[in-house]
Protein backbone atom coordinates (compact mmCIF):
# COMPACT_ATOMS: atom_id res chain seq x y z
CA UNK A 1 0.00 0.00 0.00
CA UNK A 2 2.88 2.35 0.74
CA UNK A 3 4.28 1.77 -2.74
CA UNK A 4 0.95 2.89 -4.22
CA UNK A 5 1.05 6.05 -2.11
CA UNK A 6 4.58 6.82 -3.30
CA UNK A 7 3.57 6.12 -6.91
CA UNK A 8 0.61 8.49 -6.73
CA UNK A 9 2.76 11.11 -4.98
CA UNK A 10 5.27 11.00 -7.84
CA UNK A 11 2.45 11.21 -10.39
CA UNK A 12 1.01 14.18 -8.50
CA UNK A 13 4.37 15.98 -8.49
CA UNK A 14 4.79 15.42 -12.22
CA UNK A 15 1.21 16.57 -12.77
CA UNK A 16 1.86 19.73 -10.76
CA UNK A 17 4.84 20.55 -12.94
CA UNK A 18 2.87 19.96 -16.14
CA UNK A 19 -0.33 21.64 -14.95
CA UNK A 20 -3.44 20.40 -13.17
CA UNK A 21 -5.99 19.01 -15.60
CA UNK A 22 -7.80 15.77 -16.40
CA UNK A 23 -5.94 12.77 -15.02
CA UNK A 24 -3.47 15.09 -13.31
CA UNK A 25 -6.16 16.51 -11.04
CA UNK A 26 -7.40 13.02 -10.21
CA UNK A 27 -3.91 11.77 -9.37
CA UNK A 28 -3.34 14.80 -7.15
CA UNK A 29 -6.57 14.15 -5.27
CA UNK A 30 -5.68 10.49 -4.73
CA UNK A 31 -2.19 11.42 -3.54
CA UNK A 32 -3.59 13.91 -1.02
CA UNK A 33 -6.05 11.36 0.36
CA UNK A 34 -3.37 8.66 0.64
CA UNK A 35 -1.01 11.10 2.34
CA UNK A 36 -3.57 11.91 5.03
CA UNK A 37 -4.48 8.23 5.52
CA UNK A 38 -0.85 7.16 5.94
CA UNK A 39 -0.09 10.12 8.20
CA UNK A 40 -2.94 9.15 10.53
CA UNK A 41 -1.86 5.49 10.48
CA UNK A 42 1.72 6.51 11.30
CA UNK A 43 0.67 8.64 14.26
CA UNK A 44 -1.63 5.92 15.62
CA UNK A 45 1.00 3.19 15.25
CA UNK A 46 3.64 5.45 16.79
CA UNK A 47 1.66 6.03 19.98
CA UNK A 48 0.24 2.51 20.34
CA UNK A 49 3.56 0.88 19.43
CA UNK A 50 5.42 2.73 22.17
CA UNK A 51 2.88 1.80 24.81
CA UNK A 52 2.75 -1.92 23.91
CA UNK A 53 6.49 -2.64 24.19
CA UNK A 54 6.96 -1.32 27.72
Curated annotation (Swiss-Prot):
One CC-aspect GO term: plasma membrane
Superkingdom of origin organism: Bacteria
Main location group: membrane
Membrane topology summary: Multi-pass membrane protein
Keyword entries, A-Z: Cell membrane, Membrane, Transmembrane, Transmembrane helix
Subcellular location: Cell membrane
Membrane-spanning residues: 4-24, 29-49
Entry keyword annotation includes Nucleotide-binding: no
Keyword Repeat: no
Stored InterPro entries: DUF1328
Similarity annotation: Belongs to the UPF0391 family.
Protein name stated in the entry: UPF0391 membrane protein PSPPH_0249
Amino acid sequence: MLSWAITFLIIAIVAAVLGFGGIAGTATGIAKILFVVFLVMFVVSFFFGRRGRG
